[in-house]
Each structure stands twice: as structure tokens, then as C-alpha cells.
């Protein structure tokens, strides 16, 4: 792309602070053009970052990063921050191996303090840092940028409740309101009241008045009425009561696309010396007509797109698991009036939108509140409904206690459907859905299935909604759904997919890796028996019988090896006094860097070549031991 007069000279936040206000405004336009050009080629979170350009510029002009930590909640709004901290050149390989992460990354820059990309955690991080700096006498301000739905998460409000009781913390909370959570309010009087309320002289005067008035008869009541009247006037003007009632000072609303206005608000907040909320109004997808016009999500996350029209350039990869689930839910909804859908701020991504269109009164979107989603679903089950909770696999982590103690302990007939299970790839460590089976495996009575194709998915979903005495979990991957796989025979909950010798190598696979396992067989010199359980947890009798007859077992899964399918099978055999050599192929117990799903799977030996190699190595080892 052509040289950008301002952006090309930005190497660090000091360069941003040297700009005039007019230059800062011009820089914002250059950054938008840069983002549209780069992200349209690589994919990524485009809409959220287009909405925070001026805000991020203002943050770096007012605060001294990294001395003053800037923490981005969920992290997907950090692209502009990366650009202003010297990483613009890395956008050529955004979310690719060796390139920039799509989220803050401590390995990339000292300006990135927190890299967890799950929502609603920034305020807890910020409070902890601010307390640490205060206790050590350090003159540093911590900034947390939260919004884009993250304030619907309970953890954020737990933090706000704690922060409200921590006066003296140099903590600025920027609420990035992109119009999807609050009603915008503007007005000169409201702005003046905000300035007055954060003026230290005003606070001193208020304290003096309180001491003077409350010494008199009825003084406390009079002061309370005066303070309530003042608060009521401001709340009526700008609707900040939800924050001020907590005891946290509030500034705003501020036009988030006016650099000077945002700077002035941030300067006031910085000078105040106590926790302050700065309410900034922004437009998601700002400056890209196609994004602003997209009512569904304003191009929240895109693949490769046309940088002018916004049209997707991604080649069709066939039907997705999400689409298959969506269709199955619509069919279930027509037959079963007790079926309800539950989601955590992801109605469209998880495939519940078609069901909601048919049955709007039978869908509950709880916001970014997975804990609440699972327990609310348990309550629905207790009342006679059968809820289907659809989440991304990685977000089930946040609701484990509710799964264990609310759904599990109460034998609740709740079905949890986990999209994006296994390796997701480009979004990095925090978004891989590799933890779910290990967690689910310790919930007594829970049943889990990893369907291998559409017919298997539809079948187990129909079975799951008929189970009313325990939670059920269905997990599937981000990849396109494979063609239906032929079943040779079935017995005791186990499907035989390739009929090799029963006393030879038993290759056990589930989910998306069944197709890879069958492809691996074609690369082997000797026959192998391939089986797949209809329900992976608990281990079915058919799998135990097959493993007991086999010479050795190789298990293949796109979840953690620890507490995975192979380890559960080994434990089931051990409980029966049996033992067989078992080689478990899966994801190691470590965090994985961002890359394409296919590249990571190949690196871990979970593609057909890697599976074939593992089988060959096991056979060679056995032949060597017993020759």
C-alpha cells in the first residue's frame, strides 16, 4: 500500500504524543485504511478495532505505556495498540505462524501486560496491578479498556464491587460503549458536572460541607438529601447511576471518535487519583461502510474479505458443524416444545439463530455469562424443560463449577453443545478447545460424544435431549463437517469403521479425527481395526471388549492426552484387572501458539501421516520386544 505520511513514522507511543491534535486525527484515518487493507487479507477482528482507533490514540497520548499499563479486555480490540507500539510491520502475518498474535502477547512487547483473551477479566487484573503499585509507592496509573459485551460478564461486576471499596487506587476504567449495551446521552451540562465532580477542590469542598452540616441537628439527613439531589440531577441527564451507585466516579459519555474530547476526559481521570470510569461512545466498524451496515456483528471477526465491498473471499469448504447443528435444532424444535436454546452472547456463531427465528420465546441469550447459562439451564431442566446450551468449547472452562455442582450433582437433563472443540488455531492458546474432555471426564455420570459426521451428530443430539437424569455434552471442531462415514458393524455402543483383525492393532478415534484415522490405514502395510464410540464418556462396553482382545491400542483425539479417551480406556481396563499397550495421540499439556489448524495438527502428529507413523512405530516396538 502507498506510504502513509504519519503512520510510517510511528515507532512507539512517544511518537504519538508528539503529534498535534490535527495530526492525531489524520493518523486515525491512516490507521483505519491500514486495518482494512491488512485484516481483509489475513482475517481477524476488524469491526472492534475500527471502533477504537481514536480512543487508543488518546490513551497513548495521555498515559505512558508501558509504565502505565493499558489492559484490553478480551484483547481483540488491541490491533491499534499494537500499531502504536511499533508492530505495524507484523500485520502482514497477523494470526499466522511467526506473525503477530490476534490478541495482546507478552512475547511480542513490553506494552502487553495481559494476554488472556477471555472476556470480563480486565478489571480484576487492573485492580490487582493498581494495588500492587500503590503498596510499593509507585506513581503509576493502570488503565482497563472494557466493552464490546464484556460488561455482561459477572466477573467484571465482581471487580467493580471490589474496586468501589478501594479509594486511592490510580485506576481508570474506560467503558468502550459501541451502542450495544447503553443508551447514548450527551449534553454540555452533563460534561460540566463530570468536570466538577472530578476536581479535587470540589471533593475537598464536599468533605468540608459534610463535616460542617452533619455536626448540626438533622445535619446527616440534610446532607443526604443534598447529595441525593445532586446525584439525581446528573443521573437523569446522563444515566450513570449504575456506576455512581457503586461509589465510583464517572465521566461521560464522551464521543469516542473525537480525539481531543477523549484526551480531556482521560486527563481528568488521570489527575483524580482514585478509581474513575470514563464512558466512551464508539461505533463498531467505524469508517468501513460495509462493516457499519452489517447489523449482525459489524464485521466483529472476518476471514479474507474484499477491502471495498466487505464480501467474503473465502473459498467454500463445504457445510460446517455449526450449520449441521443449526438444522438439527430447528427440526427438534418443531417436534419438541420443551426444547429451549441457551447461549452466552453468541447466538449466530454457535448456530442458534435459525432456532431463535422460529421460536424466539424459546431462546435465552445470557450475555457473556457462561456460569449463569449452565446453572440457569439446570433450573430449566428442574422445571420440566430440556435446555440445549451452545457454547464455544474454550468458554466452558468458565462454567466448570456449575457443570460439576449444579448440572452434575443435581442430575440435570441439560445438553451442552461445544463448538470449536479441539484445535482452533489462529486465535491462539486461549481459544483452543482442548480442555473440555478432561474437565467433563471427572463429572460423575456425565455423557460425552464427539460425533464424526452429520448423521452421528443428529443421532446423538436426538438421544441427548431424551436423557433427563444427567448432563450430556456434544463436542465438534471448527473444520468443515466430513462426508458421512460408513459403519461396518456396531455393538455395545461402539461403531466399527474398518474391519481389521480383532487380535491386531486397534485404532480408536472419535470426532473429526475418525476421517484422519481411516486415511492413515490406507498408508499402512498391515491391516488395522478402526473403531469409534458413539459416546466417548463413559467408556462403552464395546470398546473395553475390543481393547481386551487387541494386541495393542492406539487412541486418537483432538483434546488433551491427559484425561482423554485413551487414558479413560486404560483406566477402564485397569479397573477390570486387564492391561494392554496403549499409545495415546492427542494434544500435549501445554499452551499452543497461533497457527493454522492444519499446521498444528500436523506438528502434533494428528494428521493421517502422523497417525500412520505412530501405528508403525508401535508395531515395530512390539515386534522388537517379542521377537
Swiss-Prot record:
InterPro entries: Dxylulose-5-P_synthase, THDP-binding, Transketo_C/PFOR_II, Transketolase-like_Pyr-bd, Transketolase_BS, Transketolase_C, Transketolase_CS. It catalyses: D-glyceraldehyde 3-phosphate + pyruvate + H(+) = 1-deoxy-D-xylulose 5-phosphate + CO2. Thiamine diphosphate binds at residues 76, 117-119, 149-150, 178, 288, 370. Its cofactor is Mg(2+); thiamine diphosphate. GO terms for cellular component: cytosol. PROSITE patterns: TRANSKETOLASE_1, TRANSKETOLASE_2. Pfam families: DXP_synthase_N (PF13292), Transket_pyr (PF02779), Transketolase_C (PF02780). Binds 1 Mg(2+) ion per subunit. Binds 1 thiamine pyrophosphate per subunit. Mg(2+) binds at residues 148, 178. Disulfide bonds: none annotated. GO terms for molecular function: 1-deoxy-D-xylulose-5-phosphate synthase activity; magnesium ion binding; thiamine pyrophosphate binding. Keywords: Isoprene biosynthesis, Magnesium, Metal-binding, Thiamine biosynthesis, Thiamine pyrophosphate, Transferase. GO terms for biological process: 1-deoxy-D-xylulose 5-phosphate biosynthetic process; isopentenyl diphosphate biosynthetic process, methylerythritol 4-phosphate pathway; terpenoid biosynthetic process; thiamine biosynthetic process. Pathway: Metabolic intermediate biosynthesis; 1-deoxy-D-xylulose 5-phosphate biosynthesis; 1-deoxy-D-xylulose 5-phosphate from D-glyceraldehyde 3-phosphate and pyruvate: step 1/1. Coiled coil: none annotated. Its EC number is 2.2.1.7. Homodimer. Belongs to the transketolase family. DXPS subfamily. Catalyzes the acyloin condensation reaction between C atoms 2 and 3 of pyruvate and glyceraldehyde 3-phosphate to yield 1-deoxy-D-xylulose-5-phosphate (DXP). This is 1-deoxy-D-xylulose-5-phosphate synthase. The lineage of its organism: Bacteria, Bacillati, Actinomycetota, Actinomycetes, Propionibacteriales. The gene is dxs.
Amino acid at each position: 500500500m502507498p506510504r502513509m505520511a504519519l503512520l510510517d513514522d510511528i515507532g512507539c507511543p512517544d511518537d504519538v504524543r508528539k503529534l498535534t491534535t490535527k495530526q492525531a486525527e489524520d493518523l486515525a484515518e491512516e490507521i483505519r485504511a491500514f486495518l482494512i487493507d491488512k485484516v481483509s487479507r489475513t482475517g481477524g477482528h476488524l469491526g472492534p478495532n475500527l471502533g477504537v482507533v481514536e480512543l487508543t490514540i488518546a490513551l497513548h497520548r495521555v498515559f505512558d505505556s508501558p509504565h502505565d499499563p493499558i489492559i484490553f479486555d478480551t484483547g481483540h480490540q488491541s490491533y491499534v495498540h499494537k500499531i502504536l507500539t511499533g508492530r505495524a510491520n507484523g500485520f502482514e502475518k497477523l494470526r499466522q505462524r511467526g506473525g503477530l498474535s490476534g490478541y495482546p502477547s507478552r512475547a511480542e512487547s513490553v506494552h502487553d501486560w495481559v494476554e488472556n483473551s477471555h472476556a470480563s477479566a480486565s478489571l480484576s487484573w487492573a485492580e490487582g496491578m493498581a494495588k500492587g503499585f500503590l503498596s510499593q509507592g509507585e506513581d503509576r496509573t493502570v488503565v482497563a479498556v472494557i466493552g464490546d459485551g464484556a460488561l455482561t460478564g459477572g466477573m467484571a461486576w465482581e471487580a467493580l464491587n471490589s474496586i468501589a471499596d478501594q479509594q486511592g487506587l490510580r485506576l481508570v476504567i474506560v467503558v468502550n460503549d459501541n451502542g450495544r449495551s447503553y443508551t447514548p446521552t450527551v449534553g454540555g451540562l452533563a460534561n460540566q458536572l463530570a468536570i466538577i465532580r472530578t476536581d479535587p477542590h470540589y471533593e475537598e469542598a464536599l468533605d468540608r460541607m459534610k463535616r460542617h452540616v452533619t455536626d448540626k441537628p438533622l445535619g446527616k439527613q440534610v446532607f443526604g438529601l443534598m447529595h441525593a439531589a445532586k446525584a439525581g440531577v446528573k443521573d437523569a441527564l446522563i444515566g450513570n447511576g449504575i456506576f455512581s451507585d457503586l461509589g465510583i466516579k464517572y465521566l461521560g459519555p464522551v464521543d469516542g471518535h473525537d480525539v481531543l474530547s477523549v484526551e480531556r476526559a482521560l486527563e481528568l481521570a488521570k489527575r483524580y487519583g482514585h478509581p474513575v470510569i470514563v464512558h466512551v461512545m464508539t461505533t463498531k466498524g467505524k469508517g468501513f461502510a460495509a462493516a457499519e451496515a452489517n447489523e449482525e456483528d459489524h464485521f466483529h471477526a472476518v476471514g479474507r474479505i474484499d477491502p471495498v465491498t466487505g464480501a467474503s473471499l473465502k473459498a467454500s469448504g463445504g457445510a460446517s458443524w455449526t450449520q449441521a447443528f443449526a438444522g438439527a435444532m430447528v427440526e427438534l424444535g418443531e417436534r419438541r416444545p420443551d426444547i429451549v436454546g441457551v447461549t452466552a452472547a453468541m447466538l449466530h456463531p454457535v448456530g442458534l439463530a435459525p432456532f431463535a427465528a422460529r421460536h424466539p420465546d424459546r431462546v435465552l441469550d445470557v450475555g457473556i455469562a457462561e456460569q449463569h447459562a449452565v446453572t440457569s439451564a439446570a433450573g430449566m431442566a428442574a422445571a420440566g424443560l430440556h435446555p440445549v446450551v451452545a457454547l464455544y468449547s474454550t468458554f466452558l472452562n468458565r462454567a466448570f463449577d456449575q457443570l460439576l455442582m449444579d448440572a452434575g450433582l443435581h442430575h440435570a437433563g441439560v445438553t451442552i453443545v461445544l463448538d470449536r472443540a479441539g484445535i482452533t488455531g489462529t486465535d491462539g492458546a486461549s481459544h483452543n478447545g482442548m480442555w473440555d474432555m478432561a474437565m467433563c471426564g471427572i463429572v460423575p455420570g456425565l455423557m460425552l460424544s464427539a460425533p464424526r459426521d452429520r448423521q452421528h451428530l443428529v443421532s446423538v443430539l436426538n438421544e441427548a435431549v431424551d436423557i433427563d437424569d444427567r448432563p450430556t455434552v456434544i463436542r465438534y471442531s471448527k473444520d468443515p463437517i466430513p462426508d458421512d462415514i460408513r459403519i461396518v458393524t456396531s455393538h455395545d455402543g461402539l461403531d466399527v469403521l474398518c474391519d481389521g483383525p480383532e487380535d491386531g492393532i486397534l485404532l480408536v478415534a472419535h470426532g473429526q479425527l475418525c476421517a484422519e484415522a481411516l486415511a492413515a490405514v490406507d498408508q499402512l502395510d498391515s491391516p488395522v481395526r478402526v473403531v469409534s464410540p458413539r459416546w466417548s464418556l463413559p467408556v462403552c462396553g464395546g470398546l473395553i471388549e475390543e481393547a481386551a482382545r487387541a494386541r495393542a491400542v492406539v487412541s486418537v483425539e483432538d483434546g488433551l492426552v491427559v484425561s482423554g479417551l485413551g487414558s479413560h480406556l486404560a483406566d477402564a481396563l485397569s479397573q477390570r484387572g486387564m492391561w494392554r499397550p496403549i499409545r495415546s495421540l492427542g494434544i500435549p499439556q501445554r499452551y499452543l501458539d497461533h497457527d493454522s489448524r492444519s499446521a498444528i495438527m500436523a506438528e502434533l502428529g494428528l494428521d493421517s501421516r502422523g497417525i500412520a507413523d505412530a501405528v508403525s512405530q508401535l508395531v515395530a516396538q512390539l515386534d522388537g520386544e517379542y521377537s
